[in-house]
């Protein structure tokens, strides 16, 4: 799958590694701080973009790995309308994405992640989708990680 990741912290770093190892293509890393995005993007030959005025690439899935408190402001980010969007926050409902897209859900890693980890252990994911198709897509994607 072609992937865009929003975030450059612990979860984004670990998930990016898993995505790349699974053979998916990371197109972009987006962060409020473009320099932070550039550091992570350089590891995967991806583009770095700012969340302030993003121009997102056309991807199969957009993974939002931002702080839980930032999810309420996703509607202000241009370029996500009607994309397949998932977030990684376990404490936030999938419906925080309902005004952004018609296909959305959650891809939540069921353990604490740190970007300093030398070897990434096998990570179980909790998945949730707003409809059967979204749930199927997220489940199949998670199985590859």
Regions found by a protein language model. Give the residues of each.
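NAD(P)+-binding Rossmann beta1-loop-alpha1 motif at the extreme N-terminus of oxidoreductases
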Residues: 1-48
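Short active-site oxyanion
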Residues: 1, 24-28, 58-62, 81-85, ...
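Rossmann-like NAD(P)(H) cofactor-binding subdomain of soluble oxidoreductases
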Residues: 34, 44-118, 138
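Loop/helix-junction capping segments adjacent to catalytic residues or to phosphate/diphosphate-binding pockets
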Residues: 13, 72, 132-135
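Cofactor-binding loop segments of dinucleotide-utilizing enzymes, especially the Rossmann-like FAD-
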Residues: 8, 31-32, 88-90, 128-130
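Internal alpha-helical scaffold of NAD(P)-dependent oxidoreductase catalytic cores
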Residues: 36-43, 119-145
């Amino acid at each position: 799958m072609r992937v865009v990741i929003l975030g450059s912290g612990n979860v984004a770093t670990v998930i990016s590694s898993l995505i790349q190892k699974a053979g998916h293509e990371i197109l972009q890393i987006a962060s409020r701080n473009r320099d932070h995005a550039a550091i992570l993007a350089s590891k995967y030959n991806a583009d770095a973009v700012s969340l302030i005025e993003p121009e997102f690439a056309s991807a199969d899935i957009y993974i939002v790995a931002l702080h839980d408190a930032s999810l309420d402001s996703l509607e202000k980010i241009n370029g996500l309308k009607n994309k397949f969007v998932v977030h990684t926050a376990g404490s936030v409902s999938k419906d925080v994405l309902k005004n952004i897209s018609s296909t959305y859900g959650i891809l939540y890693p069921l353990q604490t992640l740190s970007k300093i980890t030398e070897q990434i252990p096998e990570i179980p994911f909790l998945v949730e989708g707003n409809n059967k198709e979204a749930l199927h897509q997220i489940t199949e994607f998670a199985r590859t990680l």
